[in-house]
Amino acid sequence: MNFGQLKAYLLELIGRAPSDLCYALVTADINAALRIAAMEDTATLTEAASVTLPTDFLAMVSVYRDTATRTPLRPTTAQAINNVHRTSGTPTQYAIVDGAMLLNPEPDGTEDIVIRYYAKQADLSADSDTTAVLTKHPAIYVYGALAHHAQLIRNMEAAAIWQSQYIQAVKGARASDSVDRYSGAPMEPSVRVAP
């Protein structure tokens, strides 16, 4: 489904076109709270003490140094990096601060770092625009836009109904995502040893 199809569907369903604000609010809701595989993207960055993240970065899924033997980096806090900061070496950990990934120790070289991350869903403006969530889970946008529309026109009864449907659509997307990620197989624990 694209933005034009979504608008046409809602116009047919309720007999009026919701404000563009409704669609912007749904996209903001999705970016604030939803994290599913359809929202994931990959980027290859060059390591440095501070690496600028993609502009659509929401949250990290995984990160590794792309060397002969892939070396995963562990997440930590900026405070923890400051406490054990080293000015040179092979990075083993990272922290996210103000749109950048800080590496510790600071790298000696310039290896590639591959990140898998949750990407922001773009705002919809042209009729041909779509997002991964709109394509795979259109009910989230349908019910979210209807809930925001009902709130804007102060129809709280309808808003409660549409909000309930929106919550169900989000739960359905998360359940579907879980099945897709693990192919229906049970998850197996991975034992790690503390350094």
Language model features: what each stretch is:
Residues 1-195:
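Glycine-enriched, solvent-exposed interface loops adjoining structured elements
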